[in-house]
Amino acid sequence: MFVSRFQSSETDGLYAWARLWAALGIMTIGGFGMYSCTVALLPVATDFGLSRGEASLPYTLFTIGFGAGGIFYGWATSRWNTARVLLIASLIYGSGFLIASRAEAFWIYAVAFGLPIGFLGAAATFSPLVADISLWFERRRGFAIGIVISGNYIAGSIWPPITQALIDALGWRDALMFIGLFCLSSMPVLTLMLRRAPPILDDEGPGVQFVAPKRPLGFHRETLQGLLCIAGVACCVAMSMPQVHIVALCSDLGLGAVHGANMLALMMAAGVASRLISGWISDKIGGFRTLLLGSVLQLIALTLFLPFDGLYPLYVVSFIFGLSQGGIVPSYALIVRENFPARDAGWRIGTVMSFTLFGMALGGLMSGMIHDVTGTYEAAFLNGIGWNLLNGSIAVFLLWRAKRLLIKPTKKAI
């Protein structure tokens, strides 16, 4: 009985859940790239004789590669077997760490993080996995997406201290080599769980309960896609202000960088809970309403940063912020699955997710520039609130269109 249930490729089945946990593991390991890059910044800068700004180049290249690679791999997994694509990507990803660990010139180190680790490696472990899991669940699709996309928050909670401990014990070169060998030995094994093709790849045929409209919400498909991309940029420009600058904010306030790092870890931990809770809620109310709910909650949390500058109030606000914003990004994947053909899920979800990453990069840069001009983070928070209002306006507009056209947002798309 158990074996037959596991062998079944039905949606929401036993195999679908096993596939989900394997995908979560892959996404979590895929987070090593971002956090090893940031933790190794100071020792790398010392070894190569670089300024902080110069030593930040690998992170910048990684972020660009991670975002652009999400679009590429979204397209690739829409056309080829997910496991095959991820197997190749995981081998490139692990090898990238080995290249970086032996780099004799800084440009080789930087390119290693941008190309094999970022664009060709880690990018395959984010949006393509979200798209893949969305094809395997119907009744609990939102909850499943919330679980798998928690991987990057889990990575943010566990990899920085582990990477720091490895660097302290081995030095940054051997630490990166150890990470590379770990990735090469673990990720290919997990990809074996993803070998089966999705149960339904088309929107036609027996058992299909919902056919994606040719004009979702009355728009051309690319119009809705564009609105989701703009919303993704807007929400993450706002989201990036606390996530990228909370440590610097605490230093400016005289609270110490250690407390800032603890607040960031608290945000990440609360973000995991938020993604699970929001996923469960989205199965009840649909993607559009979940997006609007998350946007409103994030707006409230961002506003709470303005009147408080004490240690304990900022811990509380950081926790509230983490709980508020975790459901926004997963809602885009759910909206895509509710309104577009299943066969397009890979590249459409990959594109929207990549725009959220571009929003994080843009927001972090904008907030830093605003701080440099004004000398405080108050204007940067106001800037984030403005972008959040843009995101909320798009969410309200899309939900209004759905109601106006008597199209009930559904989670039945297959």
Where are these regions (language model features)?
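Helix-to-loop junctions at the C-terminal end of transmembrane segments
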Residues: 69-82, 275-286, 371-372
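C-terminal ends and interior cores of transmembrane alpha-helices
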Residues: 91-104, 297-309
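Extracytoplasmic gate region of multi-pass secondary transporters
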Residues: 37-41, 223-278
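Cytoplasmic helix-loop-helix junction between adjacent transmembrane helices
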Residues: 113-150
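Helix-loop-helix hairpin linking two adjacent transmembrane segments in secondary transporters
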Residues: 148, 152-198
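Interfacial helix-cap and linker-helix signal at transmembrane-aqueous boundaries
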Residues: 44-45, 76-77, 158-170, 250-251, ...
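C-terminal transmembrane helical hairpin of 12-TM major facilitator-type secondary transporters
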Residues: 265-271, 277, 282-335
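Hydrophobic core of transmembrane alpha-helices in multi-pass small-molecule transporters
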Residues: 28, 96, 108-123, 233, ...
